[in-house]
Structure formats: C-alpha cells, structure tokens
Amino acid sequence: ASPDCRRVFRYLKERGISGEVLQRCVHLGILYESLPYHNAVFIGRDENQVARYAFLRGIYDASGKSFKMEQAGSEKAYAFCVPAKSGCRRVAVYEACVDVLAHMTLEQRQGSRDKYRLELGGISAPKEGQSQRSMKKPQALEHFLSQDPEITEIEVCTDNDFAGRWACEHIRKAYEGSYRIIENLPEIEGADWADMAKMAARTPEKRQNREAR
C-alpha cells in the first residue's frame, strides 16, 4: 500500500469529497491506495476487524469510466462500512463506496447527526419496463442488523434512477414492519450522491468566477 494515499486523495477531493472524511477512513483502516496501480481500495471488516471484503476503484478515468472491481473472494456480508463515532440507532445504506464518502461530506457541511454508513455492494435491479421481480434482502444489511440489535432506523440513500428507486421501494417493503424507514435519494433525477458532492464542490467555483468578472 502507498504510505500517503496522495493520488487517491487528490482524485477523491477533485470529486468533492472532504479531506477530513478521507483521513477518517484511512485512520479506521478501511481505505488505502494500492501499489503499483494506485487504485482506491475500500475495505470491509468483520467483528474482529479482519478484512473480509475489498472493492477497487481506479483513479485514472478512461473514456469517462474508471476501473471498478470487487476483489475475488470478497464477502458481501462484510461490505464497506463507516461506523458511527458514538452509539447510534440509524444506518444509512448506499449502492457504492464513493456514495458513502460523498454523502458524509455533504452532511458534514450541514452539521447533520452521526450514523452508520453501509455500502450494499451494488444492487441487482431489473431493466426499466421489464417484469417487476422481487429483491432479496441485501446481505450486507442483513448481517449488519444481526450484529447490532440497537438499530431502529434505516435510511435508504440509493441513486435517483430506476434501479435506485426500485431498490429503495423493496428495502422499504422488506423492513418497514421492524424499522423506521427514511428515504433519502438525491433530489436530482438520474443522480447519485457522488454526483451531488461534485456539483456542490463546483458551485463555489462558479460563484467566484462570476464575482471575478
């Protein structure tokens, strides 16, 4: 692993993610920069802090798309999770690791309360217009809830597209009898939380450019 995560930090900061959020994840041992390819590696750990899951994201975009891959042997039950700093009864769930960091950054600026933040390891939704099959309960969320009986609220932070709305609806139906469900999708159609963080980071730049004219 790279000793300073310099390239990964630069890549993620350019996408609107705060240095404080990144430093916290590195301190927790759930984010590092791989060598020699300098991928961002997101780690999921079990109850004994043993790494059981890893997701790799390339920092060099080719044709607008970066390399993304779950490490072979990863167990989705132990997907990437940023723990709450203190006792907390809410877990927020996301489609992707970067969405976790992006939403943390946005809420940090607003002074929102602390919560557990869990990546689901992606979702498997039907294509829009196809038959509406049911969704299995996410392994990562099922395992998390089994390990923390104090949780009473699930905040669904999936993407605001067909697949994300489909997943949100099915998670709500699966858990609303036992948990309070909060639906918190990005306000812009088609966006994920990573998109929202990028837009928020660009807004001050646009304002400064206008003022300089």
Predicted regions and their residues:
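Basic, glycine-enriched DNA-binding surface that flanks or lies within the catalytic cores of DNA
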Residues: 1-77, 82-85
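Terminal peptide-recognition signature
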Residues: 12, 42, 49, 95, ...
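Short, well-ordered loop/turn elements at secondary-structure boundaries
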Residues: 36-38, 85-88, 97, 150
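Contiguous, well-ordered alpha-helical segments that form the cores/surfaces of helical PPI scaffolds
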Residues: 40, 100-107
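Short, catalytically relevant binding-site loops at active-site mouths
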Residues: 60-61, 98-100, 123-126
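TOPRIM fold recognition
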Residues: 88-89, 105-213
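Helix N-cap/beta->alpha junction signal
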Residues: 95-98, 160
